[in-house]
């Protein structure tokens, strides 16, 4: 009887459109992920650029906010402030473009029980991974997306795409464009791109936003652009404690019931972290990194952080980049240090690392290009570009030009602590 049912199921699935079965599994999986998403907060770093009508794009400012996801809502506070309020991020900026809804809004629309339209577009390569792409549409009457500008506020429909891992069913990127924009909003185009990655919170992996990009074009010709990075995510209402195993074993972190998050370290301290976790090209983004502080960290000749204090973080970025013969882009995010019973949030700039073959903080690109002139002949141009990676508190990013990646246990990174507010 079971064999007959299996044959009937196989015959039924053979008649499905391409990608339909995978879509069903992706949506079901994402509903489960959203249902178990805990109360958690992250540091949100927003880099804003603005181009006036007829002008050129220039940096506007950098904003940092604490964002708390709770009960399918996002609420905000100033960095280091635990007094979250039910407000919009624009309340902290006064003007300019800034968006929200990264944790659940876009994912909920895709994974929800509503009857949206989907179209399978095949597999595409994204950051070195083969992902299934789907186009989708959220009609205005089913949309929870709103745009707020100084001229007003309005709900918009969405047409977009998402990319899902066929093996894990995780949605790893969403690209959404507003449509059916109300006439009261002076907007020509509004585009959002969100990347998701696994983040380990108190020993459990959750799918959280890692970065987002926004682009808003107004009728006037003004163009606003945002890049957002989410770092230092942790459970809200729980704090980790640390226990040590046998000699030589890396420290272990566990959850305890403490409302307040850890304290912030003073700026301008030099901290050397020796990693206990081996990192290779097979390590997944979001994987937990454990390490220890090497050498005492002093303040006014007193030991603030003793040698051997445990450090915790995650692999924030690990992807293959084809530029200049190929290299790995590696981002290591350290979030907390435990010292003498006090847990410190780790905000610091990467200063140095151990030397490894092919490891560098930047990559130089030399280009030799020949252009054909309209009236005959040609012109040769040489250019020199430097690739560099974003500067985020507590995140060390670098390139490794090698076909295989191996950051061994004992690999050391040197940091200088910084103030949270720039």
Language-model-detected regions and their locations in the chain:
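Active-site and channel-lining beta-strand-loop segments
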Residues: 159-165, 298-299
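Structured extracytoplasmic
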Residues: 11-158, 166-172, 177-264, 421-422
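Glycine-rich, flexible loop segments associated with nucleotide phosphate handling
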Residues: 151-161, 329, 402
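Bacterial N-terminal signal peptides
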Residues: 1-6
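Hydrophobic beta-strand positions
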Residues: 123, 163-164, 336-337
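Intrinsically disordered, low-complexity, compositionally biased regions/tails
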Residues: 7-10, 87, 380-381, 400
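Contiguous beta-sheet cores, especially beta-hairpins with glycine/small-residue-rich turns
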Residues: 172, 197, 260-422
